C-alpha cells in the first residue's frame, strides 16, 4: 500500500519480498522433485543414472522442462506492460512468421512452426513485439495446436479489443515424425478468425493472401 507521500509502505515492500521468497521456494521444491522424477525415468528405461554422461542429466532435464513450460508463470497484463497505444489506424496490421516452439501435451515431444497474426485496430494498437511475446507465453506450456491458436487470438481481443483478429499457425509435430505414422514432411495448419475476419470473406481472404506472399 502507498503512503500519503506516494512511497510504498514497509508493509507492502515486506509482502512483495515474502511472495518472492515463497515463489522461489516453490520453484526450488519443484525442481528437486522433477530431478528425482527424471532420474527414475532414465533408470526405468534401462540406463545407469550414475554413469558419467548421465550424472547431471536429470537436473538439466528438469531445468529445461521448467523453461519449456515457463508460460504458466506469466500473465497477459505482465506481457503487455502498458504497450497499448491510442491510435486511429483502422487498416489491417499483420505480423507474420513468428517462430514458435511448444510441447505436445499428449507425448511431451516438441512441435514447432510459424505463427501469423493479423488484426484491425479499434482506436488502439499493440506494440509489435508484444505479439511475439503473447505467442511465447502460450507456446511455453503443454499444448495442442488448436488450443494454442485460439488462446493467441483471444489474448489479442483482451489486449486491444480490435474490430477483428486472425491467427494462423503452421507447424510440424515430432509426434508424427519420431513415432506413430513417422511422416517427416507432414505439417498442420490451424486458424482462428474473430470479428470481421470471421464475418467478412474479403477481409479474411486479404489476410490469407498477405501471409502467404
From Swiss-Prot:
Gene Ontology CC terms, in alphabetical order: cytoplasm
The enzyme's E.C. designation: 3.5.4.16
Record carries keyword Lipid biosynthesis: no
Pathway(s) the chain acts in: Cofactor biosynthesis; 7,8-dihydroneopterin triphosphate biosynthesis; 7,8-dihydroneopterin triphosphate from GTP: step 1/1
Protein name: GTP cyclohydrolase 1
Matching Pfam families: GTP_cyclohydroI
Enzymatic class: hydrolase
InterPro entries registered for this protein in UniProt: GTP-CH-I_C/QueF (IPR043133), GTP-CH-I_N (IPR043134), GTP_CycHdrlase_I (IPR001474), GTP_CycHdrlase_I_CS (IPR018234), GTP_CycHdrlase_I_dom (IPR020602)
Description of how the protein assembles with itself and partners: Toroid-shaped homodecamer, composed of two pentamers of five dimers.
Amino acid at each position: 500500500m502507498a503512503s500519503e507521500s506516494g512511497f510504498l509502505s514497509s508493509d507492502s515492500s515486506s509482502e512483495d519480498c515474502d511472495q518472492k521468497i515463497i515463489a522461489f521456494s516453490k520453484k526450488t521444491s519443484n525442481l528437486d522433485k522433477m530431478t528425482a522424477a527424471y532420474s527414475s525415468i532414465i533408470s526405468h528405461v534401462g540406463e545407469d543414472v550414475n554413469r558419467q554422461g548421465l550424472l547431471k542429466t536429470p537436473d538439466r532435464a528438469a531445468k529445461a522442462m521448467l523453461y519449456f513450460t515457463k508460460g504458466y508463470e506469466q500473465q497477459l497484463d505482465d506481457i503487455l506492460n502498458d504497450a497499448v497505444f491510442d491510435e486511429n489506424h483502422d487498416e489491417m496490421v499483420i505480423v507474420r512468421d513468428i517462430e514458435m516452439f511448444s510441447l505436445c501435451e499428449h507425448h511431451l515431444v516438441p512441435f514447432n512452426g510459424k505463427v501469423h497474426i493479423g488484426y484491425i485496430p479499434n482506436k488502439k494498437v499493440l506494440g509489435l513485439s508484444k505479439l511475439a511475446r503473447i505467442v511465447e507465453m502460450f507456446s511455453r506450456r503443454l499444448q495442442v495446436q488448436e488450443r494454442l491458436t485460439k488462446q493467441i487470438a483471444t489474448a489479442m481481443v483482451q489486449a486491444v479489443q480490435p474490430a477483428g483478429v486472425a491467427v494462423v499457425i503452421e507447424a510440424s509435430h515430432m509426434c508424427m515424425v519420431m513415432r506413430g505414422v513417422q511422416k517427416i514432411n507432414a505439417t498442420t495448419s490451424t486458424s482462428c478468425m474473430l470479428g470481421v475476419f470471421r464475418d467478412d470473406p474479403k477481409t479474411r481472404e486479404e489476410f490469407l493472401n498477405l501471409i502467404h506472399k
